[in-house]
Amino acid sequence: MTEITAEGNASTTTTVIDSKNGSVPKSPGKVLKRTVTEDIVTTFSSPAAWLLVIALIITWSAVAIVMFDLVDYKNFSASSIAKIGSDPLKLVRDAMEETTDWIYGFFSLLSDIISSEDEEDDDGDEDTDKGEIDEPPLRKKEIHKDKTEKQEKPERKIQTKVTHKEKEKGKEKVREKEKPEKKATHKEKIEKKEKPETKTLAKEQKKAKTAEKSEEKTKKEVKGGKQEKVKQTAAKVKEVQKTPSKPKEKEDKEKAAVSKHEQKDQYAFCRYMIDIFVHGDLKPGQSPAIPPPLPTEQASRPTPASPALEEKEGEKKKAEKKVTSETKKKEKEDIKKKSEKETAIDVEKKEPGKASETKQGTVKIAAQAAAKKDEKKEDSKKTKKPAEVEQPKGKKQEKKEKHVEPAKSPKKEHSVPSDKQVKAKTERAKEEIGAVSIKKAVPGKKEEKTTKTVEQEIRKEKSGKTSSILKDKEPIKGKEEKVPASLKEKEPETKKDEKMSKAGKEVKPKPPQLQGKKEEKPEPQIKKEAKPAISEKVQIHKQDIVKPEKTVSHGKPEEKVLKQVKAVTIEKTAKPKPTKKAEHREREPPSIKTDKPKPTPKGTSEVTESGKKKTEISEKESKEKADMKHLREEKVSTRKESLQLHNVTKAEKPARVSKDVEDVPASKKAKEGTEDVSPTKQKSPISFFQCVYLDGYNGYGFQFPFTPADRPGESSGQANSPGQKQQGQ
């Protein structure tokens, strides 16, 4: 059957082609004549066409008079003035006669043309066209001549009919006459066929060129994005850590030089684009070819706490960059892929905490397309960095050094009990605000991948930290007093980390010291892993549900902190809608905050730290499992409780603020002021971070590069976001 259908189709197509070829000699000549006459008749049958013709005649006649000086204006004007002065009525009558004669002739000619259009041929139409052009000067005499010519035209038509009869009798003569017409039609058809072919070829060439240009642009953007990321990280390093910034700047310059040499070798015409990228016109997240760097690098790579460690890492990076520069010269094609991975690794090594900010732009663009590439990169990066993963002790030491920064507030809190509560609550409020917003931004896809690794790392790190943190806290006080400025610069980063960590550890009702110490621990985890935050976020939602009543009592000094944070966010983002979202996000945490201050005893906290931390680990595991079941049921209750909290907090904020101000001494107020003002001083990193919170997130996609631990985190983050939208509305 298939063969028969194919043959039938082929036969039909061939017959159609044959019929066309056979009909070409007979019909096309006639068809062309008919189409020409019909076109002329249809066009000139409408009065608009004649109006256009008249307008053209008048305009071009005026142009000719002016261009060639056909009129003697002086004599004409003088004679006309003299005539008007002598006999004005004669001039008017003469003008009226001329115009009436011209108009009469014009309309009579129109009537003749319209009446005789059906009988006319191309020749007759040409004669009428000539008559039309000559009408105005010749007037009535030409009209009579046109009528006589029109009488001759039907005779010519009769002759043409005779020729058709002769064609039927003598086909050879007619074929000889019509052969040129056939050839013309065939040529036209061939040309028409060739034109689309040329168009298709041109389109293919254009597509190829555009594809090449797009590839080149992506390469440029990749390289330019590398340079910009390097520069941004260098600027951030200068703000936070002044000593290690010099080797990093040298590395940045080396990178820029390597990329420029490559581009000069490969693309000479790209230098202009490179200059644009160097000057920073391209935004960090615009290079589509760069997939978002993975937070697994953070887990495997500890953030440098001291300048000595950072300098060592900088030397390692330099060695890696030298190797990469040599390989780039040898293999230009392979480097385009490798350089993306290596640059992403280097940028995250320099500041994984801040690289996450730059990642936020890229995550939105290439999140979906790069998910598969991220998995491959995770495998390659894990193989490259087994030594770093095998050294948890070194990480713990660095983490201890980083715990020093958040340890300030809890230890100074021991001196004045009321101040302790105020400062702990302020820090917790800020940290929890970030935690709530980060919950919403958690990507759902990466949660599945990293749950197992996060739990194992959390257990190892916490077991090592329990014994070491108590020893570190005493020398920490002296160090913090010596270096307040540098720590204040680092506070924005530590606050972000504390937001992630405290959100998770608020689940355990324990004294604020323990919570402060616990806050110290998870900061490196969040920078390195960014994963425990999500499992902890799930616990935060439970806290919101379990402890609504205490939120009213304890969350009141914390609400003061919320106001300060709101003011900072509103100043940085002049957008009304995002601020509303931020306010709702900041108002929800009071339910979370109450979990911490329940146990106030602080002398016994140190004794029970080791036992409680072990129980906390077991509690987290059990809660993470239970979260999967309870989150859906508790979503509705959390929203209602948050609405109640808004009403309570609005009434109680002013009174609480005055009480807290009285309790806090001047020195600690100044420190809190520095904590609040520090984000304004370092506008570039923090404003970008907060803008992503407020602007970009709709509750449907993931904002941040942090890999979540569990699906419950994803479901909870998405559940809260619509609830907060309802509150905002």
Curated annotation (Swiss-Prot):
**GO molecular function of the protein, one example?**
transmembrane transporter binding
List all Polar residues biased stretches: 8-24, 715-729
Residues with glycosylation annotation: 75, 647
- Note whether Translocase occurs among the keywords: no
Q: How is it modified after translation?
A: Phosphorylated by CaMK2.
Q: Biological process GO terms, please?
A: cytoplasmic microtubule organization; endoplasmic reticulum membrane organization; establishment of localization in cell; heart contraction; intracellular calcium ion homeostasis; muscle contraction; positive regulation of cell communication by electrical coupling involved in cardiac conduction; regulation of cardiac muscle cell membrane potential
Taken from the record's topology, the Cytoplasmic segments are 1-47
- Segments in the Lumenal topological domain: 69-729
Position of the signal peptide: none
Q: How does it assemble?
A: Homooligomer of variable subunit number; disulfide-linked. Interacts with CASQ1 and RYR1 in skeletal muscle. Interacts with CASQ2.
Please state the pathology the record ties to this protein.
Answer: Cardiac arrhythmia syndrome, with or without skeletal muscle weakness: An autosomal recessive cardiac disorder characterized by stress-induced arrhythmias in infancy or early childhood. Patients present with recurrent syncope or cardiac arrest after physical activity or emotional stress. Sudden death may occur in early childhood. Some patients have muscle weakness.
This one is known as Triadin
The protein's organism comes out as Homo sapiens (Human)
Gene symbol of the encoding locus: TRDN
